[in-house]
A protein has these predicted regions:
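Glycine-rich, proline-tolerant flexible connector loops at the mouths of alpha/beta enzymes
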Residues: 31-43, 130-136
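Generic beta-sheet signal
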Residues: 34, 61, 108, 128-129, ...
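Conserved active-site-proximal phosphate/metal-binding subdomains
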Residues: 144-158, 164-302
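Alpha/beta enzyme core
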Residues: 15-26, 52, 66-157, 166-175, ...
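Short, small-residue-biased leader/transition segments that mark boundaries at the very start
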Residues: 1-4
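Glycine-rich nucleotide/cofactor/substrate-binding loop typically near the N-terminus or early
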Residues: 38-82, 229
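N-terminal glycine-rich anion-binding loops that anchor highly charged ligand groups
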Residues: 10-28, 259-266
Length: 302
């Protein structure tokens, strides 16, 4: 079927590896391996592993600022990965190679201008991600970004940012989207390999518990509030330099995801963390979102 119509799992660095991606695809979604800052060898190993865990399509997210982006781009083509999502940069130079490998390319965009540019480059779809999302974010909310991107391009638009249940799923379609991508909800699943402390912090989070750090650096990041974000925001308000701020967050995501240090690490999560109330299986999450979403869409205004 149409890959955009599946619930897509966000390709989150350090979080989205073969186990999670395969579990999502096996559950009827589209699993994504997040290359993040990893090297090409790791990405290739994860692709090979995912293929042993699922016979369903899955994708890879490539951060184009990764020093090994060129090598990773070749790896996904070599293994005929079904879908590539991209962030932080322009995938134009890889398009021909990817198209020849039969890959569908879906860049993540945070503005109308970016969406138009990606369509011109030959993207098959775009993922319009609102500022509600976790990790690196743009400025515009999903609610206003999605319909504007839908109006601006002639390719399918996937909505992302703030979606965690069937209500968000249904709303995305009402805004003109052809599919949804969820990140935070999938981090808090049984099959996700992040540390239990990380999952617990997402489940415990309330509506106001995310903070955006790094606005002054031009690279804002949404995390769950903790000791690290408090220190960072204090330094930032005092006009601290880039070097000092970067030192604070260096290896922060690894600290939280792998070591489970959710006080001093970077617990990246979206505002939808407030909607996540339990840790369930990928299958349960996807089924629940689909069932609730379809009920709402068929009900209309009644």
């Amino acid at each position: 079927g149409d890959v955009y119509k599946r619930q897509i799992q966000g390709g989150m660095a350090w979080v989205a590896e073969a186990n999670l991606a395969a579990a999502v695809s096996n559950a009827g979604g589209l699993g994504i391996i997040g290359a993040g800052g990893a090297d090409a060898k790791w990405v290739e190993d994860q692709i090979i592993k995912a293929k042993t865990l699922t016979d369903k399509p899955f994708g890879v997210n490539i951060m184009l600022m990764n020093p090994q982006a060129d090598e990773i781009a070749k790896v996904v083509a070599k293994h005929n990965v079904k879908v590539v999502t991209t962030g932080a940069g322009n995938p134009g130079k890889y398009m021909e190679m990817w198209k020849n490998a039969g890959i569908k390319v879906m860049p993540v965009v945070a503005s109308v201008a970016m969406a138009r540019m990606m369509e011109r480059c030959g993207a098959d779809a775009v993922i319009a991600e609102g500022t509600e999302a976790g990790g690196h974010i743009g400025e515009i909310t999903t609610m206003v970004l999605v319909p504007q991107v839908v109006d601006a391009v002639n390719i399918p638009v996937v909505a992302a940012g703030g979606i965690a249940d069937g209500r968000g799923f249904a709303a995305a379609f009402m805004l003109g989207a052809s599919g949804v991508q969820m990140g935070t909800s999938f981090v808090a699943t049984k099959e996700s390999t992040v540390h239990d402390n990380y999952k617990a912090k997402i489940v415990k989070a309330k509506d106001i518990d995310t903070k955006v750090t790094g606005r002054s650096t031009g690279h804002p990041v949404r995390n769950l509030r903790n000791k690290q974000t408090n220190t960072y925001l204090k330094l930032e308000s005092e006009g601290a330099g880039l070097e000092q701020l970067e030192k604070l967050t260096l290896g922060g995501l690894r600290k939280a995801v792998v070591d489970g240090d959710v006080d001093n690490g970077s617990v990246m999560a979206g505002q939808s963390a407030g909607l996540v109330k339990e840790i369930c299986s990928c299958k349960d999450l996807i089924t629940k979102v689909m069932t609730q979403g379809e009920q709402l869409l068929s009900k209309g205004f009644d």
